[in-house]
Amino acid sequence: SFPLLPLIGAERAVGFANQLIKPLFQSLEELIVLLAKLKMTLHPSLAVVVITGSYGKTTFKEMLASALKTSYSVLKTPQNINTRLGIAKMIIKDLKKNHQIMIVEAGAYQKGEIKKICQLVRPSFGVITIIGFMHLERFKTLTNIRQAKMEIIPFIKDKKKLFIPAADH
């Protein structure tokens, strides 16, 4: 039982408990990301494709993986896993020596998330599918959405390996 419950009420007690455990979960996430980064250093020749956008990420990822797997050993993020933590877990669990290409779906619910994913996987290729009004309630403006998706650009050194749509939808 939670001794403060009668004094502060259930809602505040839950909020208090959440504040107590939040740093623990954040530290655990950072540890998982660090382990994934270390594992990535063991694969210097791995080609990494990061796919972001408002729509079509999962479909494009699946189509690209299907086309490439006939000639290469390909690892891709499962289903619609597209967060830094989900990607880090996949790297730790599934990345093997024989993989030549890793295809990563990168989602964002706020600015900075695409950047953090790119810092983790260090992409060789970047794809932005369509930039639209998905998650407008979180980003507030289409400009903010566009800026979040464009965080991929500085990580692609060879701009011939960066694919961006000609217009937003």
List PLM regions with ranges.
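Phosphate-binding loop of NTP-binding sites
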Residues: 1-162, 166
